[in-house]
Amino acid sequence: MERKVFSKDGQELRTIDLDDGVFNIDVSYGSIYNAINNELANLRVGTASTKTRAEVRGSSKKPWKQKGTGRARVGTRRNPVWVGGGIALGPKPRDYSYKLPKKVKRLAFKSVLSLCASVDDRLKVVENFTIDSGKTKELALIIKNFIKHNGRTVILLGNDDQMIKRAGKNIRDLKILSFNRLRVVDLFYTKNLIALESAINGLNELYVK
């Protein structure tokens, strides 16, 4: 599968081969769904915590005698029914993370890359560049040449270029990611995917096996 390579000014330069096994497979929406759920679960902190009737402050003495007062029977002021009492069945700190099978993860990445490249043409391949000044304005002018849809934009780098990342910090709805540190959720929800040549070559090597 061939794709046009553009200069940072938006001019056509040449073509690049996208491996069909990475960028042109039948999209598995099930694997994408499982991968996104896994990524979001792994991000959860899981620190929500409430006190049970055993942990809440208060006396365990019976407020009044069992019978003869006309009031409802109560055993303790820490009763979950009472204001200030313990919480019944409330959340406790827990780890929500879990492992996803490697084959499912790989299939999810290939599927979402194919979705971007083949199905709705979100992918634009751009020659390698850097932002020596680290200025936001310079990067914003480059991005403007390739934005096809309003919304989230992802730039894929072939390396960890700190100057490009610095330039993109103040641009709304923009994420700058290295090709080997991707998340399916970022690619699935992006409207525009701008990939540097080095990132495409890296993805071809990483997922072609």
From Swiss-Prot:
CC annotations in GO: ribonucleoprotein complex; ribosome
Keyword Ribosomal protein: yes
Function: One of the primary rRNA binding proteins, this protein initially binds near the 5'-end of the 23S rRNA. It is important during the early stages of 50S assembly. It makes multiple contacts with different domains of the 23S rRNA in the assembled 50S subunit and ribosome. Forms part of the polypeptide exit tunnel.
Keyword terms, alphabetized: Ribonucleoprotein, Ribosomal protein, RNA-binding, rRNA-binding
GO molecular function: rRNA binding; structural constituent of ribosome
Binding partners and assembly: Part of the 50S ribosomal subunit.
Name under which the protein is recorded: Large ribosomal subunit protein uL4
Protein family per UniProt: Belongs to the universal ribosomal protein uL4 family.
Pfam family, one: Ribosomal_L4
A biological process from GO: translation
The encoding gene: rplD
Lineage of the species this protein comes from: Bacteria, Pseudomonadati, Spirochaetota, Spirochaetia, Spirochaetales
